[in-house]
From Swiss-Prot:
The record marks K33, K254 as: Transition state stabilizer. Its EC number is 2.7.2.8. This is Acetylglutamate kinase. Catalyzes the ATP-dependent phosphorylation of N-acetyl-L-glutamate. It comes from Psychrobacter sp. (strain PRwf-1). GO terms for cellular component: cytoplasm. One of its GO terms (molecular function) is acetylglutamate kinase activity. It catalyses: N-acetyl-L-glutamate + ATP = N-acetyl-L-glutamyl 5-phosphate + ADP. Its main location: cytoplasm. Belongs to the acetylglutamate kinase family. ArgB subfamily. Pathway: Amino-acid biosynthesis; L-arginine biosynthesis; N(2)-acetyl-L-ornithine from L-glutamate: step 2/4. It is an enzyme of class 2 (transferase). Substrate binds at G68, G69, R90, N194. NCBIfam families: argB.
Length: 303
């Protein structure tokens, strides 16, 4: 494809602008949680895959953790099975866990791997069961009624991350592969657990001490009380916004995941609008970004 002079100049300007960021992030690990509209829109799927391949090509080390809740819902519906939720968490009995594992570890994971490979990458798919990549335990939840009585909630095979075998991921990175991880964990007895993909991505980033954690979502970012996107937050400011109710509802678990990662040693975490084409590249290689960045050193992270 040939470019006219104006197009060539524009391309050169883009590359020149990106150069300092490419140099800054060279050889750094970037953990990306892939989900939401970016997984269901064919154009956004291809855009994401190309972004990941480009990151690897210019010297970064992307690690992808994906969701797939809607795909699980679709298969359960086709099978005529009901799947209840409590506080947004899927109640997962043994038969439902089999479906979750089949969808996330099978069709969804391999679809992402194939798409990245189609665009020139060397992706390899994993679940937390492979080489005990994600050690998990049963997630314990409780609820308090109007009388102040607390009772346990049994979500079945829903888990939380105990540890991540980072050696497996580092071995793959060292061999020039792009790890693509399904959010399924395993306990010491060999039981499989369905784990929230945001939480898995956060823990993977923490155990790898990644440079950046990116959570692709269906929202523009964290909003202030006026409805404007907040581009940068410190952990202290996040705590204040949760306390005063600015951050509430379904945003709290996602922001808490990002916050925990930053407090665990990840340089920065960002909630990204995954509906924007090339959102991953825009967030890393430009000043503007397309979401809300959280960092202990906000000035350095935004520079």
């Amino acid at each position: 494809m040939s470019l006219n002079l104006a197009q060539a100049k524009t391309t050169a300007e883009v590359l020149t602008t990106a150069l300092p960021y490419i140099q800054r992030f060279e050889d750094k690990i970037i953990v990306v949680k892939y989900g939401g509209n970016a997984m269901t829109d064919p154009e956004l799927e291809s855009s994401f895959a190309r972004d990941v391949v480009l990151l690897k090509t210019v010297g970064l080390h992307p690690v992808v953790v994906h969701g797939g809740g809607p795909q699980v819902d679709n298969l359960l519906k086709e099978l005529g099975r009901q799947s209840d939720r409590i506080d947004g968490m899927r109640v997962t009995n043994k038969s439902t866990m089999d479906v979750v594992e089949m969808v996330l570890g099978g069709s969804v994971n391999k679809s992402i791997v194939s798409l990245i490979n189609k665009h020139g990458g060397r992706a390899i798919g994993l679940t937390g069961k492979d080489a005990n990549l994600i050690r998990a335990k049963k997630l314990l939840m409780s609820t308090t009624d109007a009388n102040g009585q607390t009772s346990d909630i049994d979500l079945g095979f829903v888990g939380e991350v105990v540890s991540v075998n980072k050696d497996v991921i580092m071995m793959l990175i060292g061999s020039n592969f792009i790890p693509v991880i399904a959010p399924i964990g395993v306990d010491s007895e060999g039981n499989s657990y369905n784990i929230n993909a945001d939480l898995v991505a956060g823990k993977v980033a923490e155990f790898l001490q990644a440079e950046k954690l990116m959570l692709l979502t269906n929202i523009k970012g964290v909003m202030d009380k006026s409805g404007n996107v907040v581009t940068g937050l410190t952990p202290k400011k996040v705590d204040e916004m949760i306390e005063d109710g600015t951050i509430s509802g379904g945003m709290i678990p996602k922001i808490q995941c990002a916050l925990d990662a930053v407090r665990g040693g990840v340089k920065s975490a960002v909630i990204v609008d995954g509906r924007v084409p090339n959102a991953t590249l825009l967030e890393i290689f430009t000043n503007e970004g397309v979401g809300t960045l959280i960092s202990r050193d906000l000035g350095a992270a935004l520079s």
